[in-house]
C-alpha cells in the first residue's frame, strides 16, 4: 500500500526538480523593472486574504483590481523585451477592445458563454461589462501564449513556421487560457461578481462557458499571431498564478473542489511546458 505512492513520488521527483530549476532560471531572467512589477504583483496576491480579514470583504473589488493591474504590468513589461512599442500597444489595444466586445455580446445575447450577468460590485462598467474584465484577458493571454510556445515550439524561426503550426499554438494557448477559468469562475460567482441565469454542471458554471472561453481565446490568439514571446518568464507567471489560486481557493476561500480541478487543469499545462523548456535548456547547454 505504501509502495505505490513511493513509486509515483520517485517518478515525479526528477520532473518536479527540473521544473523547480527551470522556474528559478525564469526568475533570474527578470530585469530590474520586471522584478519590481513581479514583487508588486506577488505582494498584492499574498496580502489579499490579510487585507480582507482586517479591513473587511468590501475591499475585495479593490484588491482584485490591483491584482489584475499589477499582473498586466508584469506581463506587458515582459513582452516589451522582444516587442516594439507600437506592436505592444497595438496588440494590447486589440485584446482590450476585442475582449470587451466579446463580453458585451455574451452578456446581452448569451452567445459563447451562456446567459450570465455582472453584478454592480465591479465598477465602472461599460455596456454592462466591468472595465476590469478586458484587462483580466490581457493579463493571462501572454502567459498562455508562452505555455503553447514552450510545448509546441520546434525551434525554427517563427517567421518560417507553418500556418498549421501557428494554428495549433493558437488552439493550445486558448486551452491553457481556459484552464485558468476553472479557478476564476467558481471564485467570482461565489463572491457575487457575476451570476448565471441557470446554474451549470461545474460548481454552478455551465460547461458551455469553458467552450466559449476556449473559442474566444483561440480566435484572439490566431488574429494577433504573437511571435517572439519570452517563454520562461511568462511561464513563471502562469505557474505562480496556478499555485496562488490553488492556495487561495483551497485554504483561504473554502473552495477545495475548484482548487483541485484548477490545479489539475492549469497545472497540467504548466508541467508540460516546463518539461519541454527544461529539456530544451538541457540540450542547448550541452553535456
Where are these regions (language model features)?
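N-terminal amphipathic/basic-hydrophobic helices that include classical n-h-c signal peptides
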Residues: 1-18
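Aromatic-rich, lipid-facing transmembrane alpha helices and their immediate juxtamembrane interface loops
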Residues: 14-287
Amino acid at each position: 500500500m505504501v509502495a505505490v505512492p513511493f513509486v509515483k513520488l520517485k517518478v515525479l521527483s526528477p520532473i518536479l526538480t527540473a521544473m523547480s530549476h527551470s522556474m528559478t532560471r525564469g526568475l533570474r531572467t527578470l530585469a530590474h523593472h520586471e522584478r519590481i512589477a513581479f514583487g508588486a504583483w506577488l505582494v498584492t496576491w499574498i496580502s489579499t486574504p490579510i487585507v480582507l480579514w482586517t479591513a473587511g470583504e468590501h475591499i475585495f473589488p479593490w484588491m482584485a483590481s490591483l491584482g489584475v493591474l499589477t499582473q498586466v504590468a508584469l506581463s506587458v513589461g515582459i513582452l516589451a523585451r522582444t516587442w516594439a512599442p507600437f506592436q505592444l500597444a497595438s496588440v494590447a489595444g486589440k485584446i482590450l477592445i476585442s475582449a470587451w466586445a466579446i463580453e458585451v455580446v455574451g452578456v446581452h445575447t448569451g452567445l459563447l458563454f451562456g446567459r450570465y450577468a455582472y453584478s454592480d460590485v465591479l465598477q465602472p462598467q461599460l455596456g454592462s461589462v466591468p472595465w476590469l474584465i478586458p484587462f483580466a484577458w490581457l493579463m493571462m493571454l501572454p502567459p498562455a501564449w508562452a505555455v503553447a510556445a514552450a510545448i509546441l515550439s520546434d525551434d525554427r524561426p517563427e517567421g518560417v513556421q507553418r500556418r498549421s503550426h501557428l494554428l495549433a499554438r493558437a488552439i493550445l494557448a486558448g486551452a491553457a487560457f481556459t484552464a485558468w477559468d476553472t479557478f476564476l469562475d467558481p471564485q467570482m460567482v461565489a463572491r457575487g461578481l457575476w451570476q448565471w441565469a441557470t446554474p451549470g454542471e461545474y460548481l454552478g458554471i455551465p460547461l458551455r462557458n469553458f467552450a466559449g472561453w476556449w473559442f474566444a481565446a483561440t480566435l484572439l490568439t490566431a488574429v494577433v499571431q504573437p511571435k517572439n514571446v519570452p517563454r520562461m518568464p511568462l511561464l513563471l507567471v502562469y505557474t505562480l498564478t496556478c499555485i496562488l489560486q490553488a492556495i487561495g481557493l483551497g485554504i483561504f476561500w473554502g473552495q477545495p473542489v475548484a482548487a483541485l480541478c484548477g490545479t489539475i487543469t492549469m497545472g497540467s499545462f504548466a508541467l508540460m511546458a516546463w518539461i519541454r523548456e527544461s529539456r530544451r535548456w538541457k540540450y542547448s547547454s550541452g553535456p
